[in-house]
Amino acid sequence: MRVLHCFDAENARLGASDIARRSDLPSSTAHRLVVELTSVKLLERFADGKYGISTHAWETFVRANPLERLRLQAQSILGDVHDEMGQYVSLAVPDFSDRTILYVERFDAPDSYIRILGRHASRLDVHTTSSGLVMLAFASPQTIKAVTSTPFKDSITGEITDGAAVAAMLPEIRAKGHIVFVGGLVPENTAVAAPVVDRKGLVRAAMGVVARTGEIDVNHVTSTVLDACQKLSLRLQKDAIY
C-alpha cells in the first residue's frame, strides 16, 4: 500500500526512484514491489519508464468497492441539488479511525471563483469540515468518545483543537439534524451539511453544499440538503448491502 499511496492527481506517473523516495522505502525494496505490482497489473509501466496506477486496478477497485455503489446511488440526487443550487455539492464518508473524511463525489459550482479544498477522492479532517462534524454528531457515543478523546491537529494549518471543545459542539448539531458552518477552512465560505443514515440509523455519509457567505440563502439550502439526504437515506435503506 505504501507504493500505491505514492500516486495522486499531481503525481499520476512516477519513476522507480520517485516511488522509493515518496514511500520512504529502500530503493531495492521499492523496485521489487513495483515489479511485483506491475506483474499483477496493479501498476502499469509506460514507454518513458515511469509507472502509474493501471486501468486494471481501477476496474477492480471500482467494481468491488461499496463506495462506488454509494456514489452511484447518490449521483442523481446530488445532481438535482446542484442543478437547483448552482453551488458546490459534495458527498463524503467518514473514517473515524483516522479522524478524517473522504470525498467520494462532488459537483462544482459553474463559476470557479469559490475556493474549495474538498476534492474528489481526497481527505480532510473530521473536525474542520461541515460534513465531518455532522457525521461525528450522528456517530455512536462510543465513536464520539474515541474520536474526541485527544486533541485534534489541523492537517492544513497545524492548529491544535481540544477534543472536548469539538465534543461540546455535537449535541446541538445532532438536535438540529444539520450544520451551518460559517468560515471554517475557507473564511469566506458557508457550508451546510446533513447526514445520510442506513436502515440501522448508522451514519454512512454526509451531503454538503458550499457557497460564498452572503451569496447563499441558508434556509433554502438547508431545506434542500435535508430533503436530499432523506431521499438518499431511503435509497440506502432499501438496498440489501446496507
Task: List the model feature ranges, each with a label.
Residues 98, 176, 199-200:
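Residue-level recognition of short loop/turn positions
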Residues 1-67, 233-234, 238:
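N-terminal helix-turn-helix
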Residues 163-176, 180, 185-188, 203-242:
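Juxtadomain coupling helices with adjacent low-complexity linkers
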Residues 192-199:
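A short, hydrophobic, proline-anchored segment that marks a local hinge/packing element in signaling
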Residues 52-150:
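Amphipathic alpha-helical effector-binding/dimerization core
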Residues 155-156, 187:
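Intrinsically disordered, low-complexity polar/acidic regions
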Residues 1-14, 79-105, 227-242:
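An N-terminal domain-start capping segment
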